[in-house]
Amino acid sequence: DKANKKTSHSIFKKSVQIAAAIIVPFIIITTLVYNAGNKASPLSDMIVSVEEGEKANIILPDSTKVNLNAQSLLSYNVNEFNRKERRINFSGEAYFEIAKNNKPFIIQTSHMEVQVVGTSFNLRARDENISTEIDLLEGKVNLTSNTTKESILLLPHQKAILDKKSGKIKIVSGTPVESTAWRKGQLVFHGVDIKEVFREIERTY
């Protein structure tokens, strides 16, 4: 166990230096390296994984702040991020404060693409849930369904719910207090299946 902790700590320090990301403890950082013979090429992907019962705050190379909830996974290409665009892959739940930049910030989930420039929102894209939800607090967000290719512009105080089965997106009134309660260590449920309530409690604690 001690050896594993030392290895994780070493990878953490190296990853921060190379990717310019600031990451709090209790998360797993993995960098993928492509080998050519005995020589390793520069680091390609940064992967941030938050385990069950934990949370994490990270700052991406463009100064975007991300507050990750338990059982979340975020990754991006170190060499390509913030060149022509700022693209990440994501699953789980997180609160994003996107740094203002003329390069679009794109979040790719398994069922939806989220494109923004500078804004704040909560994104819930857990693989086991029947929907993907985004609650917008500030700015504007363009959403595109991977299934139907439907694009919708989301405005402040609106919430988008994408049905994974049909791929359709519907817009409802935002519930920022409810959707971001987890950031304060609180769980708020409204009209949620009891199984999901138990899953969230298990995930959080």
Would you name each region that the model predicts?
Residues 3-205:
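A residue-level detector for the "anchor" residue at the start of short, highly conserved motifs
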